[in-house]
Amino acid sequence: MNDVSKVSLPKAIFLMGPTASGKTALAIELRKVLPVELISVDSALIYRGMDIGTAKPNADELKAAPHRLLDIRDPSQAYSAADFRRDALAQMAEITAAGRIPLLVGGTMLYFKALLEGLSPLPSADPEVRSRIEQQAAELGWEALHQQLQEIDPVAAARIHPNDPQRLSRALEVFFISGKTLTELTQTSGDALPYQVHQFAIAPASRELLHQRIELRFHQMLASGFEAEVRALFARGDLHTDLPSIRCVGYRQMWSYIEGEISYDEMVYRGVCSTRQLAKRQMTWLRGWEGVRWLDSENPDRARKEVLQVVGAIAD
């Protein structure tokens, strides 16, 4: 696309960053001074009844700055990057038609990538192939299947944990159906996003500061009733640890504690560690992200001013 046609496209803003970096607070401040509407880009915030452990904006924050694509799925339901792209594009079109600018805020980098670049042409799920993979897993264990994926697609294997049966079986399924690896196919993009996008990433200047923020927030969640929230989900009886919702950081560790697998102290330790690992993965994505402007989360006023300098001109 040439520069002239790109300038004529409608505007959009991405506000990305690792967990606990202050994205939501900045987005809410920006909505006060810019003609923007917020769209959540978070694979955990989509779930109803999962508010504390996901750091979902509270009622006052949502009144000041409504977020779209929150609470759109029950924790028992799946939600893919393709689902997100479809829903986000519909919301963006609605916002643009109303003469406002979509501000997409969150930390699910796969969703941002799917939206920006389009989706690769992956084969549809095949129940017969999936059943065969699950039978193999029952006989050999997921660790053995992960080793199989390591031989077929080492790049995907490095990204997928042996204890993540959903993603592991999908990577194998794609290969068995198409004869091509998940890595090969995901390098083929679909339709690019038809917007002129201004991209920002917010994070603390040092890893130590981010780790401190993560630990503090986890303890704040515990003090706010996180255990009771997960116990309510556990009591339903239809949820389990193979679901993406219950595999969310914090929830998986609290679930293990409720099941009696680990102590409370171990749950806290693992919850903080898994959140740090999530932040590390998010930062790895962002460091390789093209066209992003970095903002310092330790100086929110300056971050807001930097966004306004860039976006204020396009919002006029």
Curated annotation (Swiss-Prot):
Where do the annotations place ATP binding? 17-24
One of its GO biological process terms is: tRNA modification
Read off the Gene3D superfamilies from this record.
1.10.20.140, Crystal structure of tRNA isopentenylpyrophosphate transferase (bh2366) domain, P-loop containing nucleotide triphosphate hydrolases
Residues binding substrate, per UniProt: 19-24
- Give the family per the record: Belongs to the IPP transferase family.
Q: What is the lineage of its organism?
A: Bacteria, Pseudomonadati, Pseudomonadota, Gammaproteobacteria, Enterobacterales
Q: Which Pfam families match?
A: IPPT
**What is the designated name of this protein?**
tRNA dimethylallyltransferase
Enzyme superclass (EC): transferase
Mind telling me which residues the site (Interaction with substrate tRNA) is annotated on? 108, 130
The record ties this protein, via PANTHER family, to: TRNA DIMETHYLALLYLTRANSFERASE
Covalent S-S links between cysteines: none
Q: Which InterPro entries match?
A: Dimethylallyltransferase (IPR039657), IPT (IPR018022), P-loop_NTPase (IPR027417)
Biological role stated in the UniProt entry:
Catalyzes the transfer of a dimethylallyl group onto the adenine at position 37 in tRNAs that read codons beginning with uridine, leading to the formation of N6-(dimethylallyl)adenosine (i(6)A).
Q: Region Interaction with substrate tRNA: which residues?
A: 42-45, 166-170, 247-252
Signal sequence range:
none
The organism's place on the tree of life at top rank? Bacteria
